[in-house]
């Protein structure tokens, strides 16, 4: 393909001066109405609007102020939080806590990654320190009925170690034995119920099953963000029988960042979206185009955009039925003054394998028989320069096939750049899925502002969808600040 055609194809991807002054460019160039200072939160399950007075990006300090009985400073979300409950509310009360402890186990039933267990600890500790009797519920895997390999027994030692107390485990999640264990649970004690998905009624959100779960407790805390997008008995059904029903610290933090920081970001605000298919990220891209100043695209989806602009893509992954959509998204970005950057060079391979022959070519130079598997060094440089201008960044999806070392450079470069920006005070949000695996692989997870624990839940929240597990919780009482 002629270079002139390539130049023409990429000319609409970079707004003049947009990277250096993207917020200003966006305001001038937008042909469509931009939302004013407040954005409706009702589609997300909240009762009010999202503005800078109502959303906090400093969850840690907020939790400390709750513990110190000081002002929360802001109302971070319109759902009641466990931090709103005092010792007087909790002492001696039986609290049903739905956590997401769906951790990976090896063939020896040993936990290989305890991230989700550690993420649930702050809420559980807060409850036991305030004299509550904690009834802990979670699922593990996708069992078909009672399945021994999906028992929660392997979780007990690690839970006990992290909490500093001996956690008791029930052999069921409802029934007389469980009721007896609950009755003997001391203040500050923790009872782990058996896998709630051993009952098919859980995923069917069966009202009678939900009622049996709820009958064990006095109030409800949902800290399972990873399942908040599912209307299951333990995430949505129980709220009809337990009041108050509130968010745990982890769920609250997810909402603070994935709703608060994204809806009212410090600008310039950049979104990085990767992954293999446009179809799986349509909702995210469309939603972020309404909010961001800079949009960086990577991963296998870029080849659908390339082909939509008339470029040859060789044997790269392309969704033929999404070519028109790709063109529409590019036009929408231009109309809104969003600086949308596609990679200008890519790493191509002659087969999809770790030992493939590979080379770096311009985006306009992908030959027949070659497939793109990562972004190239020039693109990394351009993306990094764009990110250097930002104050808020959210990342969802890898830049290439990072599981293969030959094609991991782009993803690892983004992870390292976000770590660098985090240390400079930029708000960095890792929006779930493979991006989380990437920052953990590079060893920079600890410096990010927020790493989402949700996969599908993160995507649906970013798309602006209603999360049943969130909308079912009690509304917060507004705080004057």
UniProtKB/Swiss-Prot annotation:
Q: Does the keyword Cell division apply?
A: no
Reaction(s) catalysed by this chain, per the record, are: (2R)-3-phosphoglycerate + ATP = (2R)-3-phospho-glyceroyl phosphate + ADP
Give, as in the UniProt entry, the pathway in which the protein acts. Answer: Carbohydrate biosynthesis; Calvin cycle
Q: What is its EC number?
A: 2.7.2.3
- Spell out which residues are annotated as carrying Phosphoserine: 81
Where, in this chain's numbering, is ATP bound? 281, 300, 372, 403, 434-435
A GO biological process this protein is involved in?
thylakoid membrane organization
Q: Where does CDP bind?
A: 275, 299, 397, 402
A single GO CC term for this protein reads: chloroplast envelope
Q: Please list the residues that bind AMP.
A: 277, 281, 300, 372, 403
Alphabetical list of InterPro entries matching this protein:
Phosphoglycerate_kinase, Phosphoglycerate_kinase_CS, Phosphoglycerate_kinase_N, Phosphoglycerate_kinase_sf
> Where is ADP annotated to bind?
275, 299, 402
A single GO molecular function term of this UniProt record: protein kinase activity
* Transmembrane parts of this sequence: none
Q: Where is the transit peptide?
A: 1-75
Which cofactor does this sequence's record say it needs? Answer: Mg(2+)
Q: How does it assemble?
A: Monomer. Binds to FTSZ2-1 and FTSZ2-2.
Known role: May trigger the phosphorylation of FTSZ2-1 and FTSZ2-2.
Record-stated family: Belongs to the phosphoglycerate kinase family.
Q: What is this protein called?
A: Phosphoglycerate kinase 1, chloroplastic
Encoding gene per record: PGK1
């Amino acid at each position: 393909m002629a270079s002139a055609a390539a130049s023409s194809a990429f000319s609409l991807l970079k707004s003049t001066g947009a990277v250096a002054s993207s917020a200003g460019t966006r305001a001038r160039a937008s042909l469509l109405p931009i939302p004013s200072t407040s954005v409706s939160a009702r589609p997300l399950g909240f009762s009010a609007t999202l503005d800078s007075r109502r959303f906090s990006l400093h969850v840690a300090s907020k939790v400390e102020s709750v513990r110190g009985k000081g002002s929360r400073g802001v109302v971070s979300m319109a759902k009641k939080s466990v931090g709103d409950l005092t010792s007087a509310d909790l002492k001696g009360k039986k609290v049903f806590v739905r956590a997401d402890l769906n951790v990976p186990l090896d063939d020896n039933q040993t936990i290989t990654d305890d991230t989700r267990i550690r993420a649930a600890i702050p809420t559980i500790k807060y409850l036991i320190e305030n004299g509550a009797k904690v009834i802990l519920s979670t699922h593990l895997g996708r069992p078909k009925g009672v399945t021994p390999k999906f028992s929660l027994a392997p979780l007990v030692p690690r839970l006990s170690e992290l909490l500093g107390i001996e956690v008791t485990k029930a052999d069921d999640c409802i029934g007389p034995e469980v009721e007896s264990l609950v009755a003997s649970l001391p203040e500050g004690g923790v009872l782990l119920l058996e896998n709630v998905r051993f009952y098919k009624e859980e995923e069917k959100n069966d009202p009678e099953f939900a009622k049996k779960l709820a009958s064990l407790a006095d109030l409800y805390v949902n800290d399972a963000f990873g399942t908040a997008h599912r209307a299951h008995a333990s995430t949505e059904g129980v709220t009809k029988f337990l009041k108050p029903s509130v968010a745990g610290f982890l769920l609250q933090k997810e909402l603070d960042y994935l709703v608060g920081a994204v809806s009212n970001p410090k600008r310039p605000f950049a979104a990085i979206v990767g992954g293999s298919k446009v179809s799986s990220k349509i909702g995210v891209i469309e939603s972020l185009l309404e909010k961001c100043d800079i949009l960086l695209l990577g991963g296998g989806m870029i080849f659908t955009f390339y082909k939509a602009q008339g470029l040859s893509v060789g044997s790269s992954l392309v969704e033929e039925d999404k070519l028109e959509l790709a063109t529409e998204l590019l036009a929408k970005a231009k109309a809104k003054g969003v600086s949308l950057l596609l990679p200008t060079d890519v790493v191509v391979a002659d087969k999809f394998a770790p030992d493939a022959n590979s080379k770096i070519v311009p985006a306009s130079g992908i030959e027949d028989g070659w497939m793109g598997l990562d972004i190239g060094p020039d693109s990394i440089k351009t993306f990094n320069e764009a990110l250097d201008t930002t104050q808020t960044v959210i990342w969802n999806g890898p830049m290439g096939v990072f599981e293969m070392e030959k094609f991991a450079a782009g993803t690892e470069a983004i992870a390292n750049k976000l770590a660098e920006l985090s240390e400079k005070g930029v708000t960095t949000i890792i929006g779930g899925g493979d991006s989380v695996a990437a920052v953990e692989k590079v060893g920079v997870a600890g410096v990010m502002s927020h790493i989402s624990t949700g996969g599908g839940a993160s995507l649906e929240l970013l798309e602006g969808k209603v999360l049943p597990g969130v909308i079912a919780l009690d509304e917060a009482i507004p705080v004057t600040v």
